[in-house]
UniProtKB/Swiss-Prot annotation:
InterPro entries: PduO/GlcC-like (IPR005624), PduO/GlcC-like_sf (IPR038084), YBR137W-like (IPR010371). Pfam families: HbpS-like. This is UPF0303 protein NT01EI_1570. Belongs to the UPF0303 family.
Length: 157
């Protein structure tokens, strides 16, 4: 699969993985599912779900540090600004041989295009938040989030 095909697949994934309803109970259930799956995969991650500027779920698993929460903040900023997954944005920038700082003038202290933050989309509403993890390699972070969301929504990928 070419990089362009991979980007198209990521865009389709982002459009497919949308919620019809999202509230604090949904965030709790999804966050717990992410934590359980991270444990099953042997990953030590911090998990964060933010909706409309409010943190609805946050969990730092054993083996993580405050740096993971900082990575989440920076990756989440990318999702909220571009309404794309941080992994897709990183891949797009790599294809263009540029960075968030060079292309958009964004401070790397506040924005990170490494994988692990995914748009929280509600059908007919758009991006209303972000579901983020940090602690594993960026592809593993991305796959943890996207695969758990898909399972949570009953969507086969």
């Amino acid at each position: 699969m070419s990089s362009e095909e991979a980007l198209a697949r990521l865009a389709a994934e982002e459009q497919q993985l949308q919620f019809t309803l999202f509230n604090p109970d949904t965030a709790w259930q999804l966050g717990c599912a992410l934590r359980q799956e991270a444990g099953r995969r042997g990953l030590h991650v911090t998990i964060d779900i933010q909706f409309a500027g409010q943190t609805l779920f946050h969990c730092a698993m054993p083996g993580t540090s405050p740096d993971n929460a900082e990575w989440i903040r920076r990756k989440r900023n990318v999702v909220l600004r571009f309404q794309r997954s941080s992994y897709a944005m990183g891949m797009r920038l790599t294809l263009r041989n540029t960075t968030l700082e060079a292309f958009y003038g964004l401070d790397p202290a506040d924005y990170a295009s490494q994988g692990g933050s995914f748009p929280l989309r509600i059908v007919n509403c758009g991006c209303v938040g972000a579901i983020s993890v940090s602690g594993a390699p960026q592809l593993d972070d991305h796959l943890l989030v996207s695969e758990v969301i898909a399972r949570f929504l009953g969507i086969n990928q």
